Amino acid sequence: MTLNIKATDFCDASNSAEGVIKAINELQSGDTLIFPKNEYHFYKDRCIHKVCHMTNTDSFKAPDKYFAVLIENKENITVDGCGSTLVIHGDMCAFSLRGCKNVRLVNFTVRYASPTNFEMEVVERSLNKITYKIPTGSAFEVKNNKLTFFEKSPFSGENYYTYTANGECYCNVIHRGDEVFRTSRSPTKIALKIKKTGAHTVECRYFMSPKFKVGDVVAMSRNKLRDNCGLFFESCSDIFCERITVNYMHGFGWLSQMCENLSFDKLTFKPASGYRVSSFADLIHVCGCKGYVKITDSHFEHPHDDAINVHGAFLRFRKACDERTAEL
């Protein structure tokens, strides 16, 4: 007998992580996990975490990965979002399949409450002063002449992440109308004085203002650390994804590694309103997979790296099990 298992039978949409884990544990072959249309909020300090390796990330520096939704070792299941949005709070992976076979993921949106690319829009400019507007979802403070971005847990009061724009943000991209280009210029590193002038504005004073224009949006990577990815498939086969919208992904985009037969149809990678960047790095990233990878009828917009990246991988050789088998 197959069942439709509703996430709302196990969780409150305002704090979904622990209840969704219980719902996933109930899934059997042929079942569908349904998210009745709503916004489902996932907070990092309420989510599951495991040590695992993700290619192209700093897994040695950050081996412990946090997951908003983690489905492991399930076969012949469907996850139907019914148009829902998964809202991610914290620098973690939004959705992961590990060791799964014949899974359909359909009709949901992934949105990060506070993206980890930091954006500053030029709203006023003079010879030695620029005022920048920061999106409403990005919390920040100015202290000791340093601009710091952060996201705070509502449970512990501790920050999920804290990054200082003056020193840590190293890769700057300017969005100017339909143009997007990389620049070595920084809104903060050469600032003589940084002052918070409103709930969402900062003023930077310079010896000579950078040659930004009013309307430019400067997008900054928080630092070089790729400690996780936005969505993650590992050792899975026959996975079908359809009508999924991604507003942003932390870490390293939508990563599939050591998988077989993947289909991506009608995906939309588009920043949420008020933002310009849809991913900290790549959008779809495929490593060490076999069979087919089909990407059809999809829209890709403004990642901070590649839209699609497919490659093999160097793996660590651990030991020879026999003449034909190695442990990697």
Annotate each PLM feature:
Residues Y160-S235, F240-E242, N247:
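Long, low-complexity, polar/charged, intrinsically disordered or flexibly structured peripheral segments
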Residues I21-E26, H41-T78, V87-V106, S114-N128, ...:
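Extracellular beta-strand-rich solenoid/capping regions of secreted or surface-exposed proteins
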Residues F35, T78-G81, N102-N107, V214-G215, ...:
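All-beta strand scaffolds that present successive hydrophobic residues in beta-strands
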Residues H89-C100, N107, D238-R243, S256, ...:
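Extracellular beta-rich repeat passengers
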Residues F95, R111-R176, N309-L328:
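Autoprocessing Asn-cyclization modules and mimics
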Residues M54, C259-V293, A320-T325:
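Long amphipathic alpha-helical scaffold regions
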Residues I5-I34:
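Acidic Gly/Asp/Thr-rich repetitive segments characteristic of extracellular carbohydrate-active
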